[in-house]
Amino acid sequence: MPALNHIIVPAKDKDVSAQFLADILGVKAQPQWGPFRPVQTSNGVTLDFVDSKDVRTQHYAFLVDDAEFDASFARVKDAGLAYFAGPHKEGPGEINHHWGGRGVYFEDPNGHLLELITKPYGELPPG
């Protein structure tokens, strides 16, 4: 089965954007590679930030375990970022509990919508 390897993420400033995501996720931004500044996730997929004058915002969701959610969500709050329970800014200052897990939405410096979830949406809880 094919696996996703990388995603190109347009950014106003690739270094600022890569470092922002790395800081929130508690990982290290990778060294620049060509025109890209990658951030690697635990499953090996990289988000390759590239400078762009035209940033069309997208949505990126990260599946994390409960401990990672707690740590990343604490960093979101410590950074003073606005966060929401829903993708259209529903439930300001709240998280959601979809599918028996926890989820939260917030924006990166480019306006990309980032999401942390502890359960994949559509996966029914046991029992």
Give the role of each language-model region.
Residues M1-D15, Y60, P120-G127:
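N-terminal beta-strand motif that seeds the catalytic metal site of vicinal oxygen chelate
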Residues H6-I8, P38, H59-A61, G103-Y105:
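Short aromatic/hydrophobic contact patches that present stacked aromatics
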Residues S17, L21, Y60, V76:
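Hydrophobic pocket/interface hotspot
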Residues Q40, V50, E107, I117-T118:
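Residue-level detector of conserved, well-ordered beta-strand and adjacent loop positions
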Residues F62-P109, L113, P120-P125:
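Vicinal oxygen chelate
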